[in-house]
């Protein structure tokens, strides 16, 4: 499977007005700014986008607005994740994925699953996903680190898992993934300190 999530990917924030409603005009400006300044793909509704604080209707409207501005000019990666495997699958099944090129899905948080638990979570999601998946390992937010061996096992077993946004902060872990990943599996930096 060809991977389109390469180069400069920008995780969009969700701009709010002072009354805490979403500022859709600011969102449109933000998307155009990123496109005008060379973003190769955009990621919507991830942790930077304040997804846990948004309602389903707000998420749907953000998706609609971003798609209407992008108009296919760059690939869109949309977040769909959580610590409840069945709920993630249900959200995948009930969401409109038209105009979206891939799904970003975080390691389950709070419950601190084992490495086998992480594997089983992503196995179920991969089997249900309508689009290519990018895993998201951010232990500083989830409380659990998906080890390199687990990442590579998942990547090898499920060809629709095309990459990982790796934010463990461990250069050693990133190096191990790069050395052992299947061909075409992308490692996207989710850690600014390791990117520089």
Model segments located where?
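Active-site beta->alpha loop and helix N-cap motifs at the rims of alpha/beta catalytic domains
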Residues: 2-145, 153
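Catalytic alpha/beta core domains of metabolic enzymes, predominantly
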Residues: 127-128, 141-196
